[in-house]
């Protein structure tokens, strides 16, 4: 089985823990608490601030990307009919084109 890792700059944030029709959940380990300084990921992906919060350790929260947002990114081209595996492969090719700091890696 392939492992899906999530990175911010050179720091591994976590691994993909679940995929369903609406959300992709990435568990953030406890030692990564300042990686999203100034709400970088929240701003970039429009995440609800309940999931990215300075007041709570990130280990207690999940970072959530909504598939509807992803479908609006031309690089992703994720279709509703795509299987979870197909979505993972497409997501693995995604990068933040503005900063090249956040990316998903398939190992």
Go through the PLM ranges and name each one.
Residues 1-107:
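Phosphate/dinucleotide-binding and metal-coordinating scaffold of catalytic cores
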């Amino acid at each position: 089985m392939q492992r899906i890792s999530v990175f911010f700059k050179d720091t591994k944030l976590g691994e993909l823990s679940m995929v369903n029709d609406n959300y992709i959940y990435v568990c953030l380990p406890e030692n990564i608490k300042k990686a999203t300084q100034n709400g970088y990921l929240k701003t970039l992906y429009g995440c609800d601030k309940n999931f990215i919060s300075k007041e709570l350790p990130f280990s207690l929260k999940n970072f959530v990307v909504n598939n509807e947002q992803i479908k609006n990114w031309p690089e992703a081209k994720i279709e509703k009919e795509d299987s979870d595996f197909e979505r993972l492969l497409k997501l693995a090719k995604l990068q933040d084109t503005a900063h090249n700091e956040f990316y998903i890696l398939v190992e």
